[in-house]
Amino acid sequence: MTVTASGGSSLARPQLYQTVPGSTIVQAEQQDRFPQQGELRELSSYFQSGLKRLAIAEIITRNSDTIVSRAANRIFVGGSPLAYIERPKVDPRNLRSAEEQRAREAKLGTVTFVESSGGGGFFSGLTAALGGAGAVRIPSGFRPINVARYGPRNMQKSLRDMSWFLRYITYAIVAGDPNILVVNVRGLREIIEKACSTPATLVALQDMRATSAGYFRNDPEAQQLVKDYFDVLIREFEAPTPSLKQRQRFAEDQQGLALPQSYANAAERRPKFVIKSTLSTVEKNEAIKAAYRQVFERDITRAYSQKVSDLESKVKNGEISTKEFIRRLGKSPLYRQQFHDRFVNSRVIELAFRHFLGRGISSAEEFTRYFDLLSAKGFAALIDALVDSQEYADYFGEETVPYLRGLGQEAQECRNWGVQQELFKYSAPFVKVPQFVTLFGEYKQPLLDQHPYGAGNDPLEIQFGAIFPSRTVNNRTNPAPFGKDTRRLLVSKGGVNNQVGSAAFQQSGTTPTKIFKLTQVAAGSSSIRSKSVGNPSIRQTESTTQAVIRAAYRQVFGRDLYEGQRLTVPEIKLENGEITVREFVRQIAKSETFRKLYWNNLYVVKAVEYIHRRLLGRPTTGRAEINAYFDISAKKGFYALVDAILDSPEYIAAFGEDTVPYERYITPKGLALRSVRGLEASEKVKASLRPAAGAQERRPEVGRR
C-alpha cells in the first residue's frame, strides 16, 4: 500500500452554540473595532442578570426529575414513567441539606409551589383552560401512549429526550442566547415521529414549561424568562427540518459538498456588507473598511492612513459598483506591492484566492489553469479572471463585499483542509512557501521514511545526547498518515545480519561496531563460564570490567558521566559478579540522572523514541510498536517502560545477560548524516592544490599579481 501525504489535521474547534458575550466580542473583533455603546449595555445587562440566571438553572436542575415525571404522566398511561428515568450518580458531598435549600429559596424568593400528582382538581384545570401560567393546549391528534405497548427501551429513550430538552433550557438561560435550542432542537420532529408522537411531545413540553414556571411564582421576571425560552424550544420543535447548505460547484475537479444547517446556525455570525447608493454614509464607510480588511487583510486607512486614490468617493457616489471597487483594489499598486512583488507566482495565486473568492485553491487542476493565465497574461489578468468568474457572481454579485467562506460558512474540502485553515489566519502573508502547491505535489509522491508521528520526533543519530531537529512546519498541519501496518525501513549496522540487512553495507576498510561482552572466568580455573560466540569478549578483571562500565554509560547516556553522577553501588555489584550487565543497564537507565535528562524534559513521543534507541539499539518501527510503549508509559510510568524494553524477547536474543547494548540499526537519514562524501570532496580539493610529483614548490613572489 502506498502512503501519501494528508490534507492536514489543523486543530479546529467549531463553535457549538452562540452566547451573548461571545457573539458580541466576535462581531467587534471581525470589524476591527471596539464594542459600541449598545453592545456594552447588552453585556452589562447580561452580567448583571448572571446570578439570577444561575439560580434559575440551579432550581430547574434540582427539580428536573419532578418536572420530567409530571410531563411523562401527561402522555403515558398504564404504568409509572418515573421508574424509567436514568438518574446520574451524584457525589454525596455535593448534596445540600433541606434546610439550606429552603433558606436559599426564601432568600431568593423562589419557594417551590408544585401541584400534587393528582393534577390539582377542577380549579387547576380551569386555570389551564383560561391560559394561565400552567396552560397546556392539547394539539389535535393527541392520544396517550400505553407504557406496556411502548416498551421499556422506548420509555427510557423518551424520558432521556425529555431530560435533554430540559437541560438545553438551562444551558440557553445561562448562555443568554436561545441559539443552542435552535441548533439542537430544530429538525428533531421528524426523528421523534418515527418512534413516538409529535402531539404527545408537544404536550410534554408544554407541561414542562408550566411546571418549571411554577417554581418562580414569586419572581415574575424569572418566570417570564423561563417561559420565553420554552416558547423558543416549542417553536423550534414544530419547525420543519432545514435543508442542507449546498456548496456550489463550478468545475468538475471541485468537490460537491453539503453542510448541515445546524452547523451553520452554530457557527460564529460573519457579517456581510453591501454598498448601495441608498445607504447612509456611516454604513458605506463600514462596508469600505470591510473591503479593505478582506483584500488587504487589514484596515489600511486606520492602521497606515493609506487610501487607494479616489476609489472610495466613486463607490460612495455610485459611479462604480462594489465588484468594480474590489477589482480596482486588486489592481492597485499597493496590493501589487504587498501581495505580488514579494512572493513567487504560486503563492500569489493562493493569496488572491483568499482575498477575492474567500477560499483556498481546490485542486491541482484549478491551480494549473490560473498559473498558466498568470504566466501568459500577467497579474491583472489573474484579478480579472477571479472577479469575473461565475463563482464570484453567485456568491457576492455586484454589491456584496467578499468574505471568508471558512468553517461554518460552508462545507470545507478535506483534501486542502489544513492549508486552508492556515490561509485564513493573520499570519498568511508572512508565509512565503506556496502551501497548496506543495501539498498537491506531495499527494503524488509517497511519504518519506520518517517517524510515524512526525519527522521532528527523530533525534539526530549522533552519540552525544538527545538532540532533535527544530521543525518550522507544525506537525498538526503537516501530518504523516502512516497506518498501523506501515513499517520503517532501517539500515543494518553492526553485528546483525538478516533478510532485511544488506551485505553491501559492510564494505572493506570500514570499522565494525565494537561489542562489549563481560565474560566471567571462575577463580583458579581457566574455564569460561559464559562463552562468547563470534565476537571477542572481555575477561572479568578490574580493568576490563571498567571498560564494560564505561561502554554502558556511553551507550545509555551518550557520553561519560562525571564522577559525582556515576552509580558506584551498581558498579561494585557488577565487579563482584552480583548482577549481570543487563541488570546494570537497568539500574543506570532508572537513575535520577537519566530520568532528568531524557524523560522529564521531553515530550513522551520523543522520550520513548530516544530511550528505545539507547536501550534496544534501533529506532521504533511503526505506530503499533510505539503505541504499546505509550500505553505502558501512561498506565505504569517511566520505570515500567524501561523494564518492558529490557525484558523484551528482542533484547534477550540480541544482547543476552552480559552484552552491553549497541547500535544495531539506523535510519537512512542517519546513514546520510554520517556519510563521508563531504570529506572525500574535501580531500579531492586538497589533492588538486598539491604540486605534482617531482615538481619543485615555488614560493610566491610578494608584490606581483
Curated annotation (Swiss-Prot):
Pfam families: PBS_linker_poly (PF00427), Phycobilisome (PF00502). Residues 685-705 are annotated as: Disordered. Its EC number is 4.-.-.-. GO terms for cellular component: phycobilisome; plasma membrane-derived thylakoid membrane. Keywords: Antenna complex, Bile pigment, Chromophore, Electron transport, Lyase, Membrane, Photosynthesis, Phycobilisome, Repeat, Thylakoid, Transport. (2R,3E)-phycocyanobilin binds at C196. Residues 146-238 are annotated as: Phycobilin-like 2. Its main location: membrane. PROSITE patterns: PBS_LINKER. Residues 253-433, 514-691 form the PBS-linker domain. It is found in: Cellular thylakoid membrane. CDD domains: PBP_PBS-LCM. Residues 77-145 are annotated as: Phycobilin-like loop. One of its GO terms (molecular function) is lyase activity. The keyword Electron transport applies. It is a peripheral membrane protein. Residues 18-76 are annotated as: Phycobilin-like 1. Residues 696-705 have a biased composition (Basic and acidic residues). Contains one covalently linked bilin chromophore. This protein autochromophorylates. Belongs to the phycobilisome linker protein family. Phycobilisomes of this organism are composed of a two cylinder core, from which six rods radiate. The core is mainly composed of allophycocyanin alpha and beta chains, and of three minor components: the allophycocyanin alpha-B chain, a 18.3 kDa polypeptide, and the anchor polypeptide L-CM. This protein is postulated to act both as terminal energy acceptor (by its phycobilin-like domains) and as a linker polypeptide (by its repeats and arms) that stabilizes the phycobilisome core architecture. Has intrinsic bilin lyase activity. This is Phycobiliprotein ApcE. The lineage of its organism: Bacteria, Bacillati, Cyanobacteriota, Cyanophyceae, Synechococcales. The gene is apcE.
